[in-house]
């Protein structure tokens, strides 16, 4: 079976940490014998637009084509305009780039799988209609919780992407409920998961891992992993750490526009690290903190729980369904005070009890095995292709 993935994020040789969760699922599908091709369209701004903003002038260094871990990945350009997800939906321009690539590269998939309703899902709807190929859509978070609320045009694009798909999948129950409320259409819950074998056992001690990573041996560490952008709650975390008299040292693992600001404040900022090294930083942590304003089902939280690392996380997206009966441990977003109080409680009241760690570990083992979930996805593919004949 030939499957064409359309997504706005996928790892590359130049940015191996971008969209790793997609590659995890593709690798598991490949093990099942599926022939996967990825098209990851990238925006290109015209000369007049590039004059408006420095970020628009930044050159995209990702290769136009590469074979990545046995998977062909194409990155055609499409014309982008400022604020396009609000006022000038890009799905038709993206679809044109996808259709052109399909024609040039003789791609004839049996099925399309689009990730994120906006913009990839909207593009998939156009490609599906033009090429007469059915598509599956996976909803991840911001495509439901954020983008449809931008404007009437954005909402219309969201509803079309969801309504035109043969099957709609959501990475959490919370997302499933919100998508139903917004669009009126049903979906099934299917998380991507993680490769659990990578998170079993550890031969090194925490001290040995910290030595290898160059981290302090004599301080408590609160570790954050992700993009260094405001929407991830990093400034609230910084403020919370600074407000505590006996605070842990903050370690920000990742890159982004806030890197220099966080470094100037005296925090440890590692920059982008290879994906396989994220596990080491989690194991080096006394606390893992993810204070995002919005999420779908954050992979790094699942990874931390698989390693039994204490987690402080905001109550956003599907995290509450992941935490289940322990969701009272989640905190409200955009609050440095809530973060400071949570850190204090974790460190001095020992609210992260062994039974909490055990329960959440078992949840991850049962529901977030990437291999098992890929088999369920394969079944969805088979159902769609059979019914569309």
Curated annotation (Swiss-Prot):
Pathway entry: Cell wall biogenesis; teichuronic acid biosynthesis
Upregulating conditions: By phosphate starvation, via the PhoP/PhoR two-component regulatory system.
CDD domains, per the entry: GT4_WlbH-like
InterPro entries: Glyco_trans_1, Glyco_trans_4-like_N, Glycosyltransferase_grp1
EC numbers: 2.4.-.-
Keyword Transferase applies: yes
Primary enzyme class: transferase
UniProt keywords, alphabetically: Cell wall biogenesis/degradation, Glycosyltransferase, Stress response, Transferase
GO terms classed as biological process: cell wall organization; teichuronic acid biosynthetic process
A single GO molecular function term of this UniProt record: glycosyltransferase activity
Disulfide bonds: none
SUPFAM superfamilies assigned: UDP-Glycosyltransferase/glycogen phosphorylase (SSF53756)
Superkingdom of origin organism: Bacteria
Note: The nature of the anionic polymer present in the cell wall of B.subtilis depends on phosphate availability. Under phosphate-replete growth conditions teichoic acids are present, whereas under phosphate-depleted conditions, at least part of the wall teichoic acid is replaced with teichuronic acid, a non-phosphate containing anionic polymer. The synthesis of teichuronic acid is accompanied by degradation of teichoic acid and reutilization of liberated phosphate for other cellular processes such as nucleic acid synthesis.
Family to which this protein belongs: Belongs to the glycosyltransferase group 1 family. Glycosyltransferase 4 subfamily.
Protein name from the UniProt record: Putative teichuronic acid biosynthesis glycosyltransferase TuaC
Organism in which the protein naturally occurs: Bacillus subtilis (strain 168)
UniProt lineage: Bacteria, Bacillati, Bacillota, Bacilli, Bacillales
């Amino acid at each position: 079976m030939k499957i064409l993935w359309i997504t706005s994020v996928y790892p590359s040789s130049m940015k191996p940490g971008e969209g790793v969760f997609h590659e995890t699922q593709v690798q598991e599908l490949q093990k099942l014998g599926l022939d996967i091709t990825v098209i990851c369209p990238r925006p290109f701004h015209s000369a007049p637009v590039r004059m408006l903003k420095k970020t628009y002038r930044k050159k995209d260094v990702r290769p136009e084509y590469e074979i990545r871990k046995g998977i062909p990945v194409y990155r055609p350009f499409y014309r982008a305009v400022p604020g396009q997800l609000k006022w000038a939906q890009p799905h038709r321009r993206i679809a044109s780039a996808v259709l052109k690539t399909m024609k040039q590269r003789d791609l004839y998939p049996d099925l399309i799988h689009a990730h994120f309703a906006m913009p990839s899902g909207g593009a998939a709807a156009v490609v599906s209609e033009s090429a007469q190929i059915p598509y599956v859509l996976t909803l991840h978070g911001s495509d439901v919780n954020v983008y449809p609320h931008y404007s009437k045009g954005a909402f219309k694009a969201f509803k079309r992407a969801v309504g035109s798909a043969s099957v709609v999948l959501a990475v959490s129950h919370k997302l499933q409920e919100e998508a139903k409320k917004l669009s009126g259409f049903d979906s099934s819950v299917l998380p991507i998961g993680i490769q659990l074998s990578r998170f079993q056992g550890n031969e090194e001690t925490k001290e040995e891992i910290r030595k290898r990573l160059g981290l302090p041996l004599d301080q408590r560490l609160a570790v954050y992993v992700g993009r260094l952008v405001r929407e991830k709650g990093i400034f609230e975390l910084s403020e919370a750490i600074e407000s505590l008299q006996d605070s842990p040292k903050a370690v920000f693992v990742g890159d982004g526009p806030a890197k220099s600001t966080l470094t100037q404040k005296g925090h440890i900022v590692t920059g982008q690290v290879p994906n396989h090294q994220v596990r080491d930083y989690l194991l080096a942590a006394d606390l893992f903190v993810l204070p995002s304003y919005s999420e779908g089902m954050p992979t790094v939280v699942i990874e931390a729980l698989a390693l039994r690392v204490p987690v402080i996380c905001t109550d956003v997206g599907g995290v509450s369904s992941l935490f289940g009966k322990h969701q009272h441990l989640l905190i409200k977003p955009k609050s440095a005070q809530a973060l400071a109080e949570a850190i204090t409680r974790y460190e001095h009241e020992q609210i992260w009890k062994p039974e909490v760690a055990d329960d959440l570990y078992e949840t991850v083992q049962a529901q977030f095995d990437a291999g098992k979930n890929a088999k369920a996805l394969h079944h969805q593919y088979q159902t769609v292709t059979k019914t569309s004949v």
